[in-house]
Protein backbone atom coordinates (compact mmCIF):
# COMPACT_ATOMS: atom_id res chain seq x y z
CA UNK A 1 0.00 0.00 0.00
CA UNK A 2 1.25 3.48 -0.88
CA UNK A 3 0.17 6.23 1.51
CA UNK A 4 0.59 9.91 0.67
CA UNK A 5 0.69 12.14 3.74
CA UNK A 6 -0.11 15.80 3.08
CA UNK A 7 0.98 18.08 5.91
CA UNK A 8 1.15 21.78 6.76
CA UNK A 9 4.53 22.73 5.31
CA UNK A 10 6.96 25.19 6.90
CA UNK A 11 5.42 24.29 10.25
CA UNK A 12 6.88 22.29 13.15
CA UNK A 13 3.45 20.98 14.15
CA UNK A 14 2.74 19.98 10.56
CA UNK A 15 5.94 17.94 10.37
CA UNK A 16 5.36 16.38 13.80
CA UNK A 17 1.77 15.49 12.86
CA UNK A 18 2.95 13.80 9.68
CA UNK A 19 5.55 11.80 11.60
CA UNK A 20 3.13 10.71 14.32
CA UNK A 21 0.44 9.82 11.79
CA UNK A 22 2.92 7.62 9.92
CA UNK A 23 3.90 5.78 13.11
CA UNK A 24 0.27 5.28 14.04
CA UNK A 25 -0.78 4.15 10.56
CA UNK A 26 2.09 1.69 10.21
CA UNK A 27 1.44 0.21 13.66
CA UNK A 28 -2.35 0.03 13.58
CA UNK A 29 -3.45 -0.02 9.92
CA UNK A 30 -0.86 -1.12 7.36
CA UNK A 31 2.48 -2.51 8.62
CA UNK A 32 3.83 -2.96 5.08
CA UNK A 33 2.81 0.45 3.72
CA UNK A 34 5.21 2.90 2.10
CA UNK A 35 4.84 6.61 2.78
CA UNK A 36 5.34 9.74 0.72
CA UNK A 37 5.26 13.20 2.32
CA UNK A 38 3.83 16.22 0.50
CA UNK A 39 3.87 19.72 1.99
CA UNK A 40 0.91 22.08 1.67
CA UNK A 41 1.07 25.85 2.15
CA UNK A 42 -1.57 28.52 2.47
CA UNK A 43 -1.57 30.53 -0.72
CA UNK A 44 -4.00 32.50 -2.83
CA UNK A 45 -6.07 30.28 -5.13
CA UNK A 46 -6.60 26.53 -4.99
CA UNK A 47 -4.92 24.80 -2.06
CA UNK A 48 -5.39 21.25 -3.36
CA UNK A 49 -4.84 19.52 -6.68
CA UNK A 50 -6.96 16.41 -7.07
CA UNK A 51 -4.26 14.93 -9.29
CA UNK A 52 -1.89 14.90 -6.31
CA UNK A 53 -4.04 12.43 -4.37
CA UNK A 54 -2.31 9.44 -5.93
CA UNK A 55 -1.91 7.16 -2.94
CA UNK A 56 -3.88 4.04 -2.18
CA UNK A 57 -4.65 6.10 0.91
CA UNK A 58 -4.22 9.88 1.18
CA UNK A 59 -4.02 11.67 4.52
CA UNK A 60 -4.13 15.39 5.35
CA UNK A 61 -2.81 16.54 8.73
CA UNK A 62 -2.76 20.05 10.22
CA UNK A 63 -4.33 21.61 7.14
CA UNK A 64 -7.67 22.62 5.73
CA UNK A 65 -10.42 20.16 4.87
CA UNK A 66 -10.83 18.55 1.46
CA UNK A 67 -14.10 16.86 0.50
CA UNK A 68 -12.30 14.79 -2.13
CA UNK A 69 -13.33 11.11 -2.07
CA UNK A 70 -9.63 10.34 -2.49
CA UNK A 71 -8.89 11.62 1.03
CA UNK A 72 -9.04 8.73 3.48
CA UNK A 73 -7.70 10.45 6.61
CA UNK A 74 -7.96 14.02 7.91
CA UNK A 75 -6.86 15.56 11.22
CA UNK A 76 -7.00 19.28 11.99
CA UNK A 77 -7.34 21.68 14.91
CA UNK A 78 -7.57 25.09 13.20
CA UNK A 79 -10.66 27.19 13.86
CA UNK A 80 -10.65 28.09 10.15
CA UNK A 81 -10.47 24.49 8.96
CA UNK A 82 -13.07 24.71 6.20
CA UNK A 83 -12.65 26.61 2.96
CA UNK A 84 -16.41 26.82 2.41
CA UNK A 85 -19.75 26.13 4.05
CA UNK A 86 -20.09 23.20 1.65
CA UNK A 87 -16.87 21.65 2.95
CA UNK A 88 -18.05 21.99 6.53
CA UNK A 89 -21.42 20.45 5.64
CA UNK A 90 -19.58 17.56 3.96
CA UNK A 91 -17.57 16.96 7.13
CA UNK A 92 -20.67 17.12 9.36
CA UNK A 93 -22.43 14.59 7.13
CA UNK A 94 -19.32 12.39 7.26
CA UNK A 95 -19.60 12.29 11.04
CA UNK A 96 -22.92 10.46 10.69
CA UNK A 97 -21.28 7.69 8.67
CA UNK A 98 -19.65 4.96 10.82
CA UNK A 99 -16.78 4.45 8.36
CA UNK A 100 -16.07 8.05 7.39
CA UNK A 101 -16.29 9.27 10.99
CA UNK A 102 -13.39 6.96 11.92
CA UNK A 103 -11.14 8.60 9.35
CA UNK A 104 -11.83 12.36 9.51
CA UNK A 105 -11.26 14.20 12.78
CA UNK A 106 -11.53 17.82 13.84
CA UNK A 107 -11.29 19.61 17.19
CA UNK A 108 -10.27 23.27 17.42
CA UNK A 109 -9.86 22.99 21.19
CA UNK A 110 -6.49 21.26 20.84
CA UNK A 111 -3.34 23.37 21.00
CA UNK A 112 -1.54 21.37 18.32
CA UNK A 113 -2.57 18.91 15.66
CA UNK A 114 0.09 16.56 17.02
CA UNK A 115 -1.55 16.37 20.45
CA UNK A 116 -4.98 16.01 18.85
CA UNK A 117 -3.77 13.18 16.61
CA UNK A 118 -2.13 11.52 19.61
CA UNK A 119 -5.42 11.67 21.52
CA UNK A 120 -7.41 10.12 18.65
CA UNK A 121 -4.78 7.47 17.93
CA UNK A 122 -4.64 6.37 21.56
CA UNK A 123 -8.32 6.61 22.56
CA UNK A 124 -9.95 5.44 19.33
CA UNK A 125 -7.37 2.95 18.08
CA UNK A 126 -5.34 1.89 21.13
CA UNK A 127 -2.05 3.24 19.78
CA UNK A 128 0.64 3.77 22.43
CA UNK A 129 1.79 7.39 22.21
CA UNK A 130 4.02 7.30 25.31
CA UNK A 131 7.26 6.97 23.28
CA UNK A 132 6.45 10.27 21.56
CA UNK A 133 5.84 12.37 24.67
CA UNK A 134 8.70 14.77 23.92
CA UNK A 135 7.44 15.42 20.41
CA UNK A 136 3.86 16.00 21.58
CA UNK A 137 5.04 18.28 24.40
CA UNK A 138 7.05 20.51 22.08
CA UNK A 139 4.40 20.59 19.38
CA UNK A 140 2.06 22.08 21.98
CA UNK A 141 4.66 24.62 23.08
CA UNK A 142 5.61 25.68 19.55
CA UNK A 143 2.17 25.72 17.97
CA UNK A 144 0.47 27.11 21.05
CA UNK A 145 3.13 29.76 21.68
CA UNK A 146 3.52 28.45 25.21
CA UNK A 147 7.04 29.75 25.68
CA UNK A 148 8.03 31.10 29.07
CA UNK A 149 8.82 34.56 27.73
CA UNK A 150 9.47 36.53 24.52
CA UNK A 151 13.18 36.09 25.21
CA UNK A 152 12.82 32.30 25.27
CA UNK A 153 10.79 32.35 22.05
CA UNK A 154 13.26 34.54 20.16
CA UNK A 155 16.56 33.30 21.58
CA UNK A 156 15.51 29.68 20.87
CA UNK A 157 17.67 27.61 23.27
CA UNK A 158 15.79 24.30 22.84
CA UNK A 159 16.37 21.82 19.97
CA UNK A 160 12.67 21.92 19.04
CA UNK A 161 12.84 25.68 18.59
CA UNK A 162 15.95 25.44 16.44
CA UNK A 163 14.30 22.74 14.33
CA UNK A 164 11.32 25.07 13.95
CA UNK A 165 13.62 27.78 12.60
CA UNK A 166 15.02 25.38 10.00
CA UNK A 167 11.63 23.96 9.00
CA UNK A 168 10.15 27.42 8.51
CA UNK A 169 13.10 28.76 6.51
CA UNK A 170 14.29 25.90 4.31
CA UNK A 171 13.86 26.17 0.54
CA UNK A 172 14.86 22.56 -0.06
CA UNK A 173 11.60 20.75 -0.85
CA UNK A 174 13.22 17.41 0.00
CA UNK A 175 14.35 18.50 3.47
CA UNK A 176 11.15 18.20 5.54
CA UNK A 177 10.09 14.87 3.94
CA UNK A 178 13.53 13.54 4.88
CA UNK A 179 13.20 14.96 8.40
CA UNK A 180 9.67 13.72 9.15
CA UNK A 181 10.47 10.03 9.88
CA UNK A 182 13.29 11.02 12.24
CA UNK A 183 10.99 13.06 14.47
CA UNK A 184 9.49 9.87 15.91
CA UNK A 185 12.69 7.82 15.69
CA UNK A 186 15.15 9.98 17.64
CA UNK A 187 15.15 12.49 20.49
CA UNK A 188 14.89 16.00 19.06
CA UNK A 189 18.44 16.85 20.16
CA UNK A 190 19.73 13.93 18.06
CA UNK A 191 17.59 14.96 15.09
CA UNK A 192 19.25 18.37 15.23
CA UNK A 193 22.69 16.71 15.21
CA UNK A 194 22.11 14.86 11.93
CA UNK A 195 24.60 16.14 9.33
CA UNK A 196 21.92 17.17 6.83
CA UNK A 197 20.25 19.22 9.59
CA UNK A 198 23.11 20.62 11.69
CA UNK A 199 24.80 22.47 8.84
CA UNK A 200 21.69 24.52 8.13
CA UNK A 201 21.46 26.11 11.56
CA UNK A 202 24.39 28.61 11.73
CA UNK A 203 23.44 30.65 8.63
CA UNK A 204 19.79 30.64 9.68
CA UNK A 205 20.71 31.99 13.12
CA UNK A 206 22.57 34.82 11.37
CA UNK A 207 19.53 35.45 9.18
CA UNK A 208 17.37 35.44 12.32
CA UNK A 209 19.50 38.22 13.82
CA UNK A 210 19.12 40.25 10.63
CA UNK A 211 15.34 39.79 10.81
CA UNK A 212 15.34 41.10 14.39
CA UNK A 213 17.28 44.17 13.27
CA UNK A 214 14.99 44.76 10.28
CA UNK A 215 11.78 44.45 12.27
CA UNK A 216 13.22 46.71 14.99
CA UNK A 217 13.91 49.30 12.28
CA UNK A 218 10.48 49.00 10.60
CA UNK A 219 8.10 48.38 13.51
CA UNK A 220 5.55 51.09 14.32
CA UNK A 221 3.98 50.69 17.75
CA UNK A 222 0.85 52.62 18.67
CA UNK A 223 -2.35 51.97 20.62
CA UNK A 224 -1.37 48.45 21.60
CA UNK A 225 -0.63 47.25 18.05
CA UNK A 226 2.64 46.83 16.15
CA UNK A 227 2.77 47.15 12.37
CA UNK A 228 5.74 46.48 10.10
CA UNK A 229 6.20 46.17 6.35
CA UNK A 230 9.26 44.23 5.16
CA UNK A 231 8.04 43.40 1.65
CA UNK A 232 11.13 45.06 0.16
CA UNK A 233 13.26 42.41 1.89
CA UNK A 234 11.77 39.12 0.62
CA UNK A 235 12.16 36.24 3.06
CA UNK A 236 10.49 32.87 3.41
CA UNK A 237 9.68 33.35 7.07
CA UNK A 238 10.64 35.03 10.31
CA UNK A 239 10.13 34.37 14.00
CA UNK A 240 6.63 35.62 14.78
CA UNK A 241 7.57 36.50 18.36
CA UNK A 242 10.14 39.14 17.42
CA UNK A 243 7.56 41.97 17.65
CA UNK A 244 6.75 41.09 21.28
CA UNK A 245 10.45 40.70 22.07
CA UNK A 246 10.86 44.31 20.92
CA UNK A 247 7.58 45.62 22.36
CA UNK A 248 6.51 43.36 25.24
CA UNK A 249 3.66 45.74 26.12
CA UNK A 250 1.96 45.20 22.74
CA UNK A 251 -1.29 43.27 22.39
CA UNK A 252 -1.28 42.66 18.62
CA UNK A 253 1.24 42.59 15.77
CA UNK A 254 0.53 42.85 12.04
CA UNK A 255 3.38 42.00 9.67
CA UNK A 256 3.42 42.44 5.90
CA UNK A 257 6.01 40.29 4.15
CA UNK A 258 6.76 38.78 0.75
CA UNK A 259 8.17 35.40 -0.20
CA UNK A 260 8.64 33.52 -3.46
CA UNK A 261 5.00 32.42 -3.64
CA UNK A 262 2.90 34.96 -1.74
CA UNK A 263 2.53 38.31 -0.07
CA UNK A 264 1.50 37.55 3.48
CA UNK A 265 -0.36 39.50 6.13
CA UNK A 266 0.53 37.91 9.49
CA UNK A 267 -2.00 38.79 12.20
CA UNK A 268 -0.94 37.83 15.69
CA UNK A 269 -1.47 38.52 19.37
CA UNK A 270 1.00 38.62 22.22
CA UNK A 271 0.97 35.25 24.05
CA UNK A 272 2.08 37.06 27.22
CA UNK A 273 -0.53 39.83 27.12
CA UNK A 274 -2.36 40.86 30.28
CA UNK A 275 -5.61 41.07 28.32
CA UNK A 276 -8.35 38.60 29.17
CA UNK A 277 -9.96 36.41 26.55
CA UNK A 278 -13.08 38.59 26.57
CA UNK A 279 -10.96 41.64 25.76
CA UNK A 280 -9.31 40.02 22.74
CA UNK A 281 -10.44 40.21 19.13
CA UNK A 282 -10.90 36.89 17.27
CA UNK A 283 -8.15 37.12 14.67
CA UNK A 284 -9.32 34.07 12.71
CA UNK A 285 -12.59 35.85 11.99
CA UNK A 286 -10.75 38.95 10.76
CA UNK A 287 -8.53 36.87 8.46
CA UNK A 288 -11.50 34.93 7.09
CA UNK A 289 -12.89 38.18 5.67
CA UNK A 290 -9.94 38.24 3.28
CA UNK A 291 -9.85 34.51 2.52
CA UNK A 292 -7.35 33.67 5.25
CA UNK A 293 -7.80 32.03 8.62
CA UNK A 294 -6.10 30.51 11.63
CA UNK A 295 -6.91 30.51 15.32
CA UNK A 296 -8.59 33.04 17.58
CA UNK A 297 -5.20 34.36 18.71
CA UNK A 298 -3.19 34.09 15.49
CA UNK A 299 -3.99 34.04 11.79
CA UNK A 300 -2.74 34.98 8.35
CA UNK A 301 -3.87 36.00 4.88
CA UNK A 302 -2.09 35.03 1.66
CA UNK A 303 -2.19 37.12 -1.51
CA UNK A 304 -0.44 36.40 -4.83
CA UNK A 305 3.02 38.01 -4.86
CA UNK A 306 1.97 40.59 -7.45
CA UNK A 307 -1.01 41.82 -5.37
CA UNK A 308 1.08 43.61 -2.80
CA UNK A 309 -1.06 46.76 -2.73
CA UNK A 310 -4.18 44.73 -2.00
CA UNK A 311 -2.34 43.01 0.85
CA UNK A 312 -1.12 46.38 2.14
CA UNK A 313 -4.65 47.79 2.09
CA UNK A 314 -5.93 44.78 4.06
CA UNK A 315 -3.11 45.13 6.59
CA UNK A 316 -3.84 48.84 7.02
CA UNK A 317 -7.52 48.19 7.68
CA UNK A 318 -6.75 45.44 10.20
CA UNK A 319 -4.21 47.62 12.02
CA UNK A 320 -6.79 50.40 12.34
CA UNK A 321 -9.39 47.94 13.63
CA UNK A 322 -7.08 46.44 16.25
CA UNK A 323 -5.76 49.81 17.41
CA UNK A 324 -9.35 50.92 17.91
CA UNK A 325 -9.95 47.77 19.99
CA UNK A 326 -6.88 48.30 22.21
CA UNK A 327 -7.74 46.71 25.58
CA UNK A 328 -5.32 49.09 27.33
CA UNK A 329 -6.03 52.59 25.93
CA UNK A 330 -3.09 54.13 27.77
CA UNK A 331 -0.63 51.67 26.22
Predicted regions and their residues:
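Glycine-rich, Lys/Arg-enriched anion-binding loops that position phosphate/diphosphate groups
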Residues: 144-238
Amino acid sequence: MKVRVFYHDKCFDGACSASLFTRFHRAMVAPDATYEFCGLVHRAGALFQEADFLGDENAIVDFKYSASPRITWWFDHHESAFLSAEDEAHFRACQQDPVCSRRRFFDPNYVSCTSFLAHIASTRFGFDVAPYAELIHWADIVDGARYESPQSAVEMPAPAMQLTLIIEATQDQAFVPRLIPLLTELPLAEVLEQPFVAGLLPPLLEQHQRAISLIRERAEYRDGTIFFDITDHPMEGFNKFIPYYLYPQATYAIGLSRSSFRTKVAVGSNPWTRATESQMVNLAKICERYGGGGHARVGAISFPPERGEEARAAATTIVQELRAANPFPSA
